[in-house]
Amino acid sequence: VSDSGRCAAADPHQRGLIAREAVALLHIMKLAVGIRDIAHLRAVQQARAKADPPLRHHTRNMPRRGDEIVDGGSIYWVIAGAVMARQAVREIIADTWDDGSPCAGLVLDPVLVPVSPRLTRPFQGWRYLAAEDAPPDLAALPRGVGEAAMPADMQRALRELGLL
């Protein structure tokens, strides 16, 4: 196994000769500071990815449990006090800030997946989020839960934000 915890090419685990130990799925939760809604986050990320690909989020510290995150985990975005969306974390790399100082780069899938909103208190940095504590994707919930009781203009606004 290499220093990064990934399998080297000659590793018998990779060739399927030895059963690989299961890695627990883990997510990260992060405040999207200055972001109004999912559409705004999408626009900011698209501009950032175009200017400096690949799409990534910089963070001061390298997550110690990174292998658990890149093995199917996501970053859950807290927008206006609630967890609102998630993005798959494809890779965690050593990166640099604009001033050249070292940081970690979370390489993200460009697709933002709306989740069932969950209020949360503000916090600094990021937090680990266990898979069983993560809010479900909105698409996984039964269609129309509470939708019929909403006024048409509210439904339209929520659809525009990608929440319905």
Whereabouts are the PLM-identified features?
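Amphipathic alpha-helical interface surfaces
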Residues: 41, 72, 85-89, 150, ...
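A generic structural signal for short beta-strands and their flanking turns/coil linkers
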Residues: 27, 71, 102-104
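Well-ordered alpha/beta subsegment
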Residues: 123-164
